[in-house]
Amino acid sequence: MAIRQLPEILINQIAAGEVVERPASVVKELVENALDAGATRVDIDLEEGGVRLIRIRDNGGGIAPEELPLAVSRHATSKIASLDDLETVATLGFRGEALPSIASVSRFTLASRRPDAEHGSALQIEGGRLGEVMPRAHAPGTTVEVRELFFNVPARRKFLRAERTELGHIEEWLRSLALARPDVELRVSHNGKPSRRYKPGDLYSDARLGETLGEDFARQALRVDHSGAGLRLHGWVAQPHYSRASTDQQYLYVNGRSVRDRSVAHAVKMAYGDVLFHGRQPAYVLFLELDPARVDVNVHPAKHEVRFREARLIHDFVYRTLQDALAQTRAGALPADVGVGGAAALGIGAVAAQGGGSYVADAGAGHPGAGSGSGYASWAPSQAPLGLRVDEARAAYAALYAPAAGSALRDDGQPVLSGTGLPATAHDSGVPPLGYAVAQLHGIYILAENAEGLIVVDMHAAHERIGYERLKQAHDSIGLHAQPLLVPMTLAVGEREADTAEREADTLASLGFEITRSGPQSLHVRSIPALLANADPEALLRDVLGDLREHGQSRRIATARDELLSTMACHGAVRANRRLTVPEMNALLRDMEATERSGQCNHGRPTWARFTLGEIDRWFLRGR
C-alpha cells in the first residue's frame, strides 16, 4: 500500500483514541478547559452515564465568535506559544487536542459569550464536519454539548460499560476535582435529576474533605504541611488504622493537577512502613507544589502522568515528610494534636528521651500480684513528668487504690478496692491522654479511665511497639556496620545492574556493601551489612540494585534490619496472662504516650481503643 496523507477527520479520530477513552474523559477535558478559563461555577448535565449527553456550562471568560472555529481545530490553544511556555506550563490543558478529538466522535455544539459581548455565538459539528458560526442568546461563559458519543465509531461504542459504571467513573473524577478545587462550585445532574452539588468553600477546606471522602476520613486524617528545597507538600494522610483494601482513596496532585506517579506512591508506602497492616493500603490527599520548570507534564496524552526532573529529591522529600508526620501518631493523641504541636501538644515534653520509666529484673513471686510471668522485665514505678508533681501523682494513686476505712483484705493480703473510681483529678485537664489504669482484663488488656471515657490497651502489642522503637533508636545511633566476607564473592549481573552499582558506590557503602566492578557484567563483593550476615548476600544485593535503579534509593537493608528488630521486640514483649501491677500498667501507658507510632504494633495492628462516655451511655440507652 502506498504512503498517503490521512484525512483530517481520521486524524482527529485517531487522536480521540488517546484522549477520549470514555465519557469520563470527555468530562475531564471539558471541565479542565472551564477552570483554565477562570470559571468559579461549573454545571455538568449527563444522560445515560454521559453516553447520550454531556453538557458542560461555565461562567468563565468565554470565546470570541471569530475564534470558535479555531478552538475546534487541532493544536490550537491560548495557553502556550513557545517551547519555554511548554516547559513551564501551569494550566491543566495545553495540547489543543481535546475539542477537535471529541468533536470528531460525537454530535458537538460549542456556544460561548465574552463578558463584554452583546450576545453569544454557537458552532455545531457532527462527526468532525464544521457548521457555520451562528448568533445565540447565551450568558457570559461557555457551554459545550456532546451528544451521542462514538455514534460514528461503533467499535468504540460497544466497549462502553453499563450506564451506572460510566456514571461511576465520572463521579470519581469529580470527587478528585472537588478535592483539588474547593473554591469552585460544581453542580451535577443525571437524566434530568440533580445528583450532586459541591458548594464552594475555603482552599483546603475540611468541610469539602468530609463531603468528598466521608466524615470518617475527615475525623481521623492528619493535616500535613511542610516546605523545603523549593518544594511544598500539604494535605491530609489517614492514620494507619484507617487503611483500605484498595487504593481507592489515594489522591495526588502536582501543581493542582491530579496525577499518578509510581515514585511518590512508593515513597508514601515506605513512610507507612511498619505501621500499616499487611496487605492494606494507605489513604491520603496530597498536594505537591514546585516550580513548573522542575516537572514535565507533557508525558501522557491524557496528562495522567508527569516526569520529575529531580525524582530522587521528590521521593526523599515525600517520604521524610510523611514519616515525620506519622511518627507523631502516639497513642492517646487526637488527629488535631499531630503535626500542630507534636509531642508538646500532648503534654509529653521530654518523656520521649526519658522513656517514662525504667526496667528492673522481674520481681517474680516476691512481687505482689506479679503472677507467674514469662521473663517480662517489669516496670519500675518511676514516671516522667505528666503535668502532675510527683507528690500529686502518688496521692492520686493512693486515693484510688488505698483500702476504704474498715475494708477487708483479700486472702493474699491485698486490699479490696473500694470502687470509688479515679481520683478527683481524673476529669481535670492534667490527666494524661491514656488516663490511669483501673484494671487488667484476662491478662491481655489494660482498662484505663481518662477524661473522655474508657481506654482499652492491648498490653503485648503496646509493649512490642515500645521495645521496637527503642531498638531502632539504638541501632540508628551506631549506624550500619560492614562485615568483610571471608572469601570475596564475584557476582554475575546484567550490564544495567553493574552500571547502577558503579554509579551508586557511595550509597552502597553507606548500606554496608563494599563493591567494585570487575567486568562489564560482574561485581566483586568484599563486605555486606553485619546485621544481615546470615542473609543470602546475592539475592539481597540484586534487590538493592533494583531499588536503586528504579527509585534512586533503597530501604531494603533498613527494612530487613527492622524485621529482625521487630522479631526481637516481639519476643521480648510482655505475654498474655502476665498479671501487671497498677504502677506497671500506668508506666506502660506513659511510655505509650511518649513513643512514636505507638498507636500500632510492629505488624500494623491497633494497640489501643477509646470508648467515650457518650458511646457507653448509648449502649445502655441512658439519656433517652
From Swiss-Prot:
Keywords: DNA damage, DNA repair. CDD domains: HATPase_MutL-MLH-PMS-like, MutL_Trans_MutL. InterPro entries: DNA_mismatch_repair_CS, DNA_mismatch_repair_MutL, DNA_mismatch_S5_2-like, HATPase_C_sf, MutL/Mlh/PMS, MutL/Mlh/Pms-like, MutL_C, MutL_C_dimsub. GO terms for cellular component: mismatch repair complex. It comes from the Bacteria. GO terms for biological process: mismatch repair. GO terms for molecular function: ATP binding; ATP hydrolysis activity; ATP-dependent DNA damage sensor activity; mismatched DNA binding. HAMAP family: DNA_mis_repair. Belongs to the DNA mismatch repair MutL/HexB family. This protein is involved in the repair of mismatches in DNA. It is required for dam-dependent methyl-directed DNA mismatch repair. May act as a 'molecular matchmaker', a protein that promotes the formation of a stable complex between two or more DNA-binding proteins in an ATP-dependent manner without itself being part of a final effector complex. This is DNA mismatch repair protein MutL.
